Amino acid sequence: TQDFFLTQEATLKEFEAAMAALDQPVEAYLSQLNSIQTHDTRARLKTIKVPTMVLAGAEDILIPMNLSRELHSLIPGAAFATAKGGHAFMWEHPKPFNEAVLGFIGKHR
């Protein structure tokens, strides 16, 4: 979210440095983007037989909420939860993220 970008300068610098250190040619990055945009596994999601949780950032502008809800609807028995924050909500708000994930895991041990 904008708040995260405005208040977490040190964290963002660390992330940017880590990304810059990756040895990824432009062609590989573009191929990755193409895969993200064109790879469609929706028809296979109904075959998932393990406990699954879809956890979405309430303010995520990269993955709209309707896509997260669609993903949830296509996985039988999946749990769905939202968390405060955007696409990087696990870094923006790690405590509630960890609580949600650990709570889900605790129910399915």
Describe the residue ranges of each PLM region.
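Conserved alpha/beta-hydrolase catalytic His-Asp/Glu region
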Residues: 1-44
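Active-site phosphate/pyrophosphate- and oxyanion-stabilizing loops and adjacent acidic/basic residues
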Residues: 69-70, 99
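Active-site acidic short loop of glycosyltransferases
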Residues: 49-50, 77
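Conserved alpha/beta-hydrolase "acid-adjacent" motif
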Residues: 61-67
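Solvent-exposed polar/charged
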Residues: 46, 73-74
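Structural signal for short hydrophobic segments within the conserved structured cores
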Residues: 34, 53, 79-81
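Catalytic active-site module of serine/aspartate enzymes centered on a nucleophile-bearing elbow/loop
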Residues: 77-109
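Short beta-strand/loop motif that positions the catalytic acidic residue
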Residues: 48, 54-56, 60
